Amino acid sequence: AFIILSAGFGEETHEGALLEERILATVNTYGASLIGPNCIGLMNTWHHSVFSQPIPQLSLQGVDLISSSGATAVFILESAVTKGLQFNSVWSVGNAKQIGVEDVLEYMDNTFDPEKDSRIKLLYIESIGDPDRLLFHASSLIKKGCKIAAIKAGSSESGSRAASSHTGAIASSDSA
């Protein structure tokens, strides 16, 4: 698995987008997974690949956060930790070149263990590659007893411009 934290790819220039495509082709050639670029990484109770602050104490009783934006994930962490909210996992997918919010939600659905996994999922979404898959796995998790709170950014014209300049997210369907 690869996590590319740095920015300066498809969200900034055409050359950056071409570099993203080359990276994705290499990752796919070797059957690897890619989170990012332009993200803060991921952390859970057994693995930490986040290189920003704050890093909260993680708890199996905490919530799962999936964010398109690393900056928004950090803002949520800073705000929540001071109020005592605990996290089980934090996933930042950034430009989501290979793995997007719906992929992480699918993973959480497919591996859900009611004895060990959080029943609360927080989603901050700038783009959705496959709205139907997101809805399928969100519905499945709800049937398993989970609660999901989601914010879809970039719905207005100005919000769409902000999301595009931030993570390179192209305005996607808000149907989910």
What are the roles of these predicted feature ranges?
Residues 1-176:
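Catalytic-core regions of core metabolic enzymes
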